[in-house]
Amino acid sequence: MSIEKNIYTGKILHLDGDRRYSDKSVKYYRQLGLDAVVKNIPEYRQASVVIELLERYKPDILIITGHDSMIKKGTDYNNIYNYRNSRHFANTVREARKWGKTSRELVIFAGACQSFFEALMLARADFASSPRKNIDRFC
């Protein structure tokens, strides 16, 4: 018995601050047959270009990533300025929500290995990375 199903995965727009990971992502999206556009954009520039890219590609899913970590002098996990790029990711999420106001319009994944999870979720990401969850995996 053969059952044929049409599966719609949605169009992906992926912004990544690291060229190596951008290139890897393109490779994996192609292998999986996903409809994805990957742009290598430094974290600090992502918020300023996200609306233009959303208008151009009209994705269902937005992935915002790059590198992030606590700064060496940072001791307060609840201060966004103690993270290298979390504020840039949060700003990009806020800008993107001007275009896709709800998760039905645009699903947003944001952050990197050690991002400020709570700030990304408050910015209205649907999914985010967490430093405490990710650090535990490598200790």
Model-predicted segments: where are they?
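Short acidic, S/G/P-rich loop/turn micro-motifs used as interaction or catalytic elements
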Residues: 18-21, 44-45, 68-72
